[in-house]
Amino acid sequence: MAELEAKKVEIVDPAPPAPGPVEAPKEVVADEKAIVAPALPPPAEEKEKPDDSKALVVVETKAPEPADEKKEGSIDRDAVLARVATEKRVSLIKAWEESEKSKAENKAQKKVSAIGAWENSKKANLEAELKKMEEQLEKKKAEYTEKMKNKIALLHKEAEEKRAMIEAKRGEDLLKAEELAAKYRATGTAPKKILGIF
């Protein structure tokens, strides 16, 4: 945090002095031009080198600015220092605000991602449980189907056995009836029970 403040202070410090000196040099430039004009070489030399004189004026306007600031005294310096202190405080507040916002955003994002992970894990557990139940149901269904098929097979077997017994009894009854009929024919007697209808 201290490093960020120091960096921001360094960035802010160069910017504020620029607006202050910009206002002062306009007046100073006029004063310097007035002062510099008599100090110029004779007109003959100016005609020969007009570009050099213009360049000297530009260079001279930049150099005397610190001297004028010293002349103005502690009033401008105090104002500039107060402005720098205010801007420093504002930049520190802004940096703190951005830091707090960033912390809050990161904290919220972390919680949201934690909730997403929790939801995904719970969903995966439920899906695994559902799949397990489906597998158990499929297994039970297969077992039940196998039992039913076995019961059907047993029923079919019993039915076949009963049919076979009925066919065997019918064969025996037919054979017995034929034997009795042959016996009655041979003896010439009539059966005691003729038909149940009569």
Swiss-Prot record:
Region feature (Disordered): 1-24
Composition bias, Basic and acidic residues: 1-11
Major subcellular location class: membrane
GO MF, one example: galacturonate binding
Membrane topology of this protein: Peripheral membrane protein
Post-translational modifications: The N-terminus is blocked.
Repeat as UniProt keyword: no
Domain of life: Eukaryota
Keyword field contains Membrane: yes
S-S pairs: none
GO cellular component, one term: plasma membrane
Pfam assignment, any one: Remorin_N
Gene Ontology biological process: cell-cell signaling
Function text: Binds to both simple and complex galacturonides. May be involved in cell-to-cell signaling and molecular transport.
Name assigned to this protein: Remorin
Organism: Solanum tuberosum
